[in-house]
Amino acid sequence: MTIRKNSGLVPINIQLYKTTPIQTILQAEQQDRFLQPAELSQLLSYMKSGVLRLEIAETLSRNSTNIVNAASNRIFVGGSPLSYLEKPEDSIDISSIDTKNTKFSFSNIFKNLFSNEDSIPAGFKPITIVKYGSNKMRKSLRDLDWFLRYLSYAIIIGDPNILAVNIKGLREIIENACSTAATIVALRTMKRTCIKLFSSNPEAESIVNQYFNVIIQEFEAPSLSDRIRKRNSADLQGLTLPQTYFLSSSTQFKYAMKPNLSVEEKNEIIRAAYRQVFERDIVKAYSLSLTKMESRVKIGQISMKEFIRALGKSSLYRKEFFDSFSNSRVVELAFRHFLGRGISSLEEFQKYFAIVSQEGLGGLVDTLINSKEYSDYFGEETVPYLRSLGEEAQECRNWGVQIKLFNYSARFQKKPQFITLFKDYQTPLPDQHPYGHSNDPLAIQFGAIFSKKTSTAFVNKDVRRILIYKGAPIENQLSRPLKLNAYKELNSYNLQIIKQSDNLTENIIRACYLRVFGRNPYTEEKLILQPIENQFRDKCISIKELIRALSKSNLFRKLYWTPFYVCKSIEYIHIRLLGRPTYGRKEINNYFNISAQGGFYKLIDAIIDSEEYSQVFGDNIIPYERYLTPYNLSLGTLRVSSIREKFKKLQPPVDKKFVELGRVKEIRSKNNIILKLNQGVSKRREQTVIFARHINNSQSSLEQIIKAAYRQVFERDIDPYTIGREFYSIETLFYAGSLSVKEFIEHLGQSELYRKEFFEPYPNTKVIELGTKHFLGRAPKDQGEIRLYNQILRSQGLKSFVKSLINSQEYIEIFGDSIVPYRRFPTLPAGTFPNTDILYKNLTKQKFFILMPSYKNTKLLSV
């Protein structure tokens, strides 16, 4: 059987009914405008009546049993009809039902009938429950309850369309099983019963009466005939559309140019023509229009048909839909614009392609507009419209591209869709896996992997995979395998059948682990599998049952079932237990059904208990790899084309001494040697001087420590600033040994001079950068550190910030009590070297930017 590509699948959900909001908004949307005051008023009245409609529906739902009971008692005699009503137990309140009237005699029936205001339908006779039968009674009570439910649905959505769609045509169906006259009597009884429930609310009574009248009228009306799609060629499909689909679908507003219309209405019709031909309102979007042709069609000099012809021949249409497209795509778009549909067949495409090739755009437009199809659908006055789903029956062939042609983005698609599809119809597909992405996928490419959303499956269940056997072959991939003993000599595969013995038991268990799990279990996993091993060692189970037990273990389930979707899991398990990939869709569908109905364990049993497993492996053979896909086989084969020539001449390396391997082969100059000696980090790290206080420091050494502290904290020598004797007292205490270097640094950081120089002029983020530079000898590490110190600054102030830096664990470990802080990262490697280097190279008083901002820089846009 030859398999060819199909047109793809675009799922379309049929609209089941109309609602007041949808119909109001849909008209404005199709006309590309805002809602008018009258439409807004209609929506407002619907919204205001929403509470009342919900109350009506709630009352009907609460009293539904009584309403159905009253209707059934009018038409059934000889028992209690309500007992045949199938409803959930909690939805029927028996105590609220008037049981006195559940049994009626013939005299009471006719007395009640003739006391009604409505006339009795001709041919009505009360129905005896015993003769009617319990099965028909249940169906009749179900139908009465169905009528009442749909009444509540229609009242809630505010449109009786759902009643017309679902009730029209039921008369013929009920006539074959029951009595039409009895149904009408029951509906009228339900109407009167419901109206009595709302006797105190005239508005609610009017709504219920209106919708019940629709139910009765639609039931009495004859069913409508199907809509026939007109066909003008023998190569086109004959199509019919049920009237219910047409009634429930969104109404396609049709515009017809009449002489007695107002100017505003004529302008709206002209704009509808623009939207159809140019796929947009060119007056609103681009302020373009064909003024001369508009005037002529308004005064009646030309018909709407000729106006459409003029639009198709205009320079704007040529520029938008002809010059930048191939002739194939021009024909497809012209069908959408002038006939409202897509191309039906290759013969139709060839006909119009020849016209556009010989006569150009004008000839194509004339042929389409002069066609009988155009005259039948649009005539002289109607603007063409899209004949989409619901408007008329759609062809099954070309479904995907047909629906895509109706999309707004169709004009942006340059590639012709229909002719490409017609070519694919005639090109057979090669054999491929039905779930694969390519023609010959890997054995591990599982599941429904499709290249396009609208082309979900190019193949059917008869397409099968290409498999290359490795070991015992089968004559036909679709037939059952032959027994292994039919092949005594297997040249392509050296098969060893391992039979159970005491010496080989452990080897068999390890081989089963490798085959089933793909690896040896871990120690803790083996403890869980120990009972299965013991059963096999005690010869209580065969190799087949050992494979079954391992496959049903939690370890196997965790490896090949839980992490994947069903199709992928089936492929994994199938390869592990049967030694080959699945043949095709028919086989994998069977396993999919087993998994859906019975679950994981049923799938394992179905594979191991299969006839193929029994004939190939039996009870004493461990499963092995039997089949491969061609691509998998090529991956595991060392091909000659992949082996370069130089690899064939490789000689084993000769061991050499380390000194010989490190010997310089080229001649190096003196400058080259100096350059290599000086490469790497600079000498700054080695040249760093650390000032520390010791017990035997001299007076001059203490002075150097004080000056180094000033330079580190204030970034300069502050001798000119000591005139005010601000630091005289702390210097005296430091010389006397009462203050350590750490305490001296802390006093400097908490001084008024430091506050004036490094706190007041800057934001908190800059203060934190300078603080870590002065007291820790580095830049801030990250945003987390900045947030921490920012919180301290904001809540406790500068002194607490300096104290937290100096008392930090980092300061104590690196500087202790006797070392003046210094630049800690003058060279690489260091995590904060780049920021520290920038921080030390910049002049603090000349550059105020923040090194590590917590937000990105933004540019002010000039207005």
Curated annotation (Swiss-Prot):
It comes from the Eukaryota. GO terms for biological process: photosynthesis. InterPro entries: Globin-like_sf (IPR009050), PBS_linker_dom (IPR001297), PBS_linker_sf (IPR038255), Phycobilisome_asu/bsu (IPR012128), Phycobilisome_asu/bsu_sf (IPR038719). Residues 235-414, 473-652, 671-852 form the PBS-linker domain. (2R,3E)-phycocyanobilin binds at residue 178. Keywords: Antenna complex, Bile pigment, Chloroplast, Chromophore, Electron transport, Lyase, Membrane, Photosynthesis, Phycobilisome, Plastid, Repeat, Thylakoid, Transport. SUPFAM superfamilies: Globin-like (SSF46458). Belongs to the phycobilisome linker protein family. This protein is postulated to act both as terminal energy acceptor and as a linker polypeptide that stabilizes the phycobilisome architecture. May have intrinsic bilin lyase activity. This is Phycobiliprotein ApcE. It comes from Galdieria sulphuraria (Red alga).
